[in-house]
Amino acid sequence: MAEGDEDSYTDSLMSNENGRPGETNLQEELQMFRARWMSELTPGLSSGGLENRPCNAAARGPVGKVSETKAKQELAKEAKARELFLKAAEEEQNGALYEAIKFYRQAMQLVPDIEFKINYTWSPDGDTKNFLDDANNDSKMADLLSYFQQQLTFQQSKLCQPDIDVTQTHISVLPMEVLMYIFRWVVSSDLDLRALEQLSLVCKGFYICARDPEIWRLACLKVWGRNCVKIVPYTTWRQMFLERPRVRFDGVYISKTTYIRQGEQSLDGFYRAWHQVEYYRYLRFFPDGHVMMLTTPEDPQTIVPRLRTKNARTDAMLLGHYRLSQDTDNQTKVFAVITNKKEEKPSDYQKYRYFRRPQVQETERSFHVGLQLCSSGRHKFNKLVWIHHSCHITYKSTGETAVTAFDIDKMYTPMFFVRVKSFTAVSERPL
């Protein structure tokens, strides 16, 4: 260091003698900087170059240390979130839902997708391990709805998120009220709850919307009216709609009757024809209390498309109202009163213009039908058994009513339900 200072001093003297004062100062500063730099590097060079590698590592050390520190912090955060999540699962199993929600929230705040990173074979203690063993044995959750609701609460996200990037506005930006109104349109006035169940398969948010109690309550009121004011003995309105006996609206009840009758005897007397007669009965119910009934030899492929609306153009069509009745023996019955479609008769003034018009007694004819609602096989409420059928003729002039009751024999075959997809393909009004 002393030799360097002497050299710098000698150079400065020479520069003062031969050069300008400004250049002399610059040279002095450069020499002093070089001297200090060499003095700092001298200890490293004295060890034979072996310490050059640690110096290079120290030069790039801060970046590596920062990345290593971040990795350790992430691992520690994930371990903490894992412990909180498993503790929340244990609290939920014990019935402490509020404590479980608190731990779930803390775990989600640390690592949002901690649920998918947990190895359920690992547990911090023995109690949690026992709980996870029980959970693995029972893979299906008892209450999927509450589980989805908790997940959406922890994540504090929207009901749904787009699966792929789209430029158009996604349905997830709609508020809850608008989404619920759309769901009511899906159910529609035809009570297409099957479409609602299919819609719930889209995502967790749609599943929660499809289980909204208000939708199922409105559906129950549409079916049973004032008879379903109380939800007891069912736990939810959805359970009532699915398990309580009711008629179905998304199809037709059909029965087929076949019998043999004699024909006319041939001229020679040696042969008598026999005819096999087939005819169908169709019964279509509507949520507003209307019912249609048709008896015809035409097959279902021809008749069923005409039964989509109540304005079917068929002469033999009977229209009326129905109601459900549940007796003390828990047998659900359907009673209906149906009449012929009212059509305007052409004026017969010209026909009897020059003659005395005959006195025709005006009458009203209606049919009273009683059916018992049953289930067959794996399908619910898909069978109607005849219990009553009568014809009521009322004479308008006297007000008297003549009742003719028909015997319920083997000609009254049970009616079975057939679902028709086209009946619920279009929604006309919301629920």
Swiss-Prot record:
Region listing for Disordered, in residue ranges: 1-24
Residue ranges the record marks as coiled coil: none
The F-box domain, residue ranges: 168-219
Biased composition (Polar residues): 10-24
Ranges: TPR repeats: 81-114
UniProt-listed GO biological process terms: protein ubiquitination; regulation of TOR signaling; SCF-dependent proteasomal ubiquitin-dependent protein catabolic process
Gene3D superfamilies: 1.20.1280.50
Xref: InterPro entries: F-box-like_dom_sf (IPR036047), F-box_dom (IPR001810), Hrt3/FBXO9_C (IPR045464), MIT_dom_sf (IPR036181)
Keywords (A to Z) from UniProt: Cytoplasm, TPR repeat, Ubl conjugation pathway
Xref: Pfam families: F-box-like (PF12937), FBO_C (PF19270)
Pathway: Protein modification; protein ubiquitination
One GO cellular component term: SCF ubiquitin ligase complex
Localization (cell): Cytoplasm
Subunit note: Part of the SCF (SKP1-CUL1-F-box) E3 ubiquitin-protein ligase complex SCF(fbxo9).
Task performed by this protein: Substrate recognition component of a SCF (SKP1-CUL1-F-box protein) E3 ubiquitin-protein ligase complex which mediates the ubiquitination and subsequent proteasomal degradation of target proteins and acts as a regulator of mTOR signaling.
Protein name in UniProt: F-box only protein 9
Organism: Xenopus tropicalis (Western clawed frog)
